[in-house]
């Protein structure tokens, strides 16, 4: 970037002014860029993995560098849900309700072995993978994962969000508004996944 001095009152050609002060891009690229760089996580934790998630917010790891430091206390103000810890069957229905209260577009990170696959708790009361009832975008392995893994997952999610070209949901004239949600593979088995909120007998696990 080059700098040059300009005297007060000196006129600059309009083309040069526009080149210095204006940015030209497509609207969908601008929206994708802003979503990518301003993820708002929902303040939600279930177990020991949540401690590592909060550690990523400390100055040592500085999650603010990635634009995801604004932790929201309400799901209606968040667009990122990090499921960190053991998900019990009793917690599945409230967790799904919190996810449904988040505004679209929204994303889910499954953090830790327990959230990914039930971990070492292969018992009747633990959901064997949060992806059985939520659409997961990024998985973080580990028991518990290190804060660096949380930052890696954020970077990976930002790359996915930046590459998505979702409709903006604008209504023009008599046209119907376009939705935000991109089709997901797990929607084909949605009814089967929604049944996960009920306790299964131990012999089915």
Swiss-Prot record:
Its main location: membrane. SUPFAM superfamilies: HydA/Nqo6-like. NDH-1 shuttles electrons from NADH, via FMN and iron-sulfur (Fe-S) centers, to quinones in the respiratory chain. The immediate electron acceptor for the enzyme in this species is believed to be ubiquinone. Couples the redox reaction to proton translocation (for every two electrons transferred, four hydrogen ions are translocated across the cytoplasmic membrane), and thus conserves the redox energy in a proton gradient. Coiled coil: none annotated. Gene3D superfamilies: 3.40.50.12280. Binds 1 [4Fe-4S] cluster. This is NADH-quinone oxidoreductase subunit B 1. It is an enzyme of class 7 (translocase). The lineage of its organism: Bacteria, Pseudomonadati, Pseudomonadota, Alphaproteobacteria, Hyphomicrobiales. PROSITE patterns: COMPLEX1_20K. The keyword Translocase applies. The keyword Cytoplasm does not apply. Its cofactor is [4Fe-4S] cluster. One of its GO terms (cellular component) is respiratory chain complex I. Residues 184-205 are annotated as: Disordered. Keywords: 4Fe-4S, Cell inner membrane, Cell membrane, Iron, Iron-sulfur, Membrane, Metal-binding, NAD, Quinone, Translocase, Transport, Ubiquinone. [4Fe-4S] cluster binds at residues 48-49, 114, 143. It comes from the Bacteria. It holds the Pfam family Oxidored_q6.
């Amino acid at each position: 970037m080059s700098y040059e001095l300009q005297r007060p009152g000196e006129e600059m050609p309009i083309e040069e002014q526009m080149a210095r002060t204006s940015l030209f891009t497509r609207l969908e690229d601008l929206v994708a860029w802003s979503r990518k760089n301003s993820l708002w996580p929902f303040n939600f934790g279930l177990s020991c993995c949540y401690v590592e998630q909060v550690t990523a917010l400390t100055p040592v790891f500085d999650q603010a560098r990635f634009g995801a430091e604004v932790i929201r206390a309400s799901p209606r103000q968040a667009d990122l849900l990090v499921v960190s810890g053991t998900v019990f069957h009793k917690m599945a229905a409230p967790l799904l309700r919190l996810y449904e209260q988040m505004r679209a577009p929204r994303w889910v990170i499954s953090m830790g072995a327990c959230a990914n696959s039930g971990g070492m708790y292969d018992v009747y009361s633990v959901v064997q993978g949060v992806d059985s009832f939520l659409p997961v975008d990024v998985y973080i392995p580990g028991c518990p994962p290190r804060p660096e893994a949380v930052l890696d997952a954020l970077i990976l999610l930002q790359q996915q969000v930046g590459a998505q070209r979702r409709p903006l949901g604008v209504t023009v004239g008599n046209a119907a508004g376009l939705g935000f949600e991109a089709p997901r593979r797990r929607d084909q088995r949605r009814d089967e996944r929604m049944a996960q909120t009920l306790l299964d007998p131990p012999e089915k696990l």
